[in-house]
Amino acid sequence: MSNKRETFQSALWRGDFGNDYIGRNPASAANVQAAAMLWAQILLRMKGAPPRSILEVGANVGINLVALRALSGAELFAVEPNDQARRGLAEASIVPQANLLDGVASSIRLADRSIDLVFTRGVLIHIHPDDLLASCREMHRVAKRYIVSIEYFSANAEELTYRNQANALFKRDFGAFWLDNFPDLRVLDYGFAWQRLTGLDNLTWWAFEKSG
């Protein structure tokens, strides 16, 4: 298990920058429904062995977890660095208090292979490239069977200004990054959520299964 290390990016999300994000992205019925439609597609790829435990790394206010609670009987876990977001998750009883962890992707206080499905949505894009491998290693360590990443895609690694903030958004082919660094992963499927039809922000998703 990695030692907790604050980075420029994690400090952003713990502070006002992260609080502002919460205000822009509530767990509204429309947002939850859009997430549920996407997750219904992804979970279909796991129907032969559905996950009994699910961890979201960077859960924020729990849009995905609310959707997953309606779709799955799995026990839910969340890692989230922002205090305000964690309070919201606790007050709404989206995950049990014991399963709600203060942390970041590079430091997950859970045992090896303890969670069937570990995922991110719009989180890897906010991790500096120098810290990305350590973060993915932690997710891989904790995942027992499945890893899912739902992120912005770019064929080439690039940094973009995000909400007038430099050093906060990094796009790449995250699917290739997973496969290049973790040879025990196999692709279950991948897809694209087109904003025009789904209401989601042109997201690419990859679903992997561990072979070991």
Regions found by a protein language model. Give the residues of each.
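Class I (Rossmann-like) S-adenosyl-L-methionine-dependent methyltransferase catalytic domain
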Residues: 1-109, 130-134, 141, 145-212
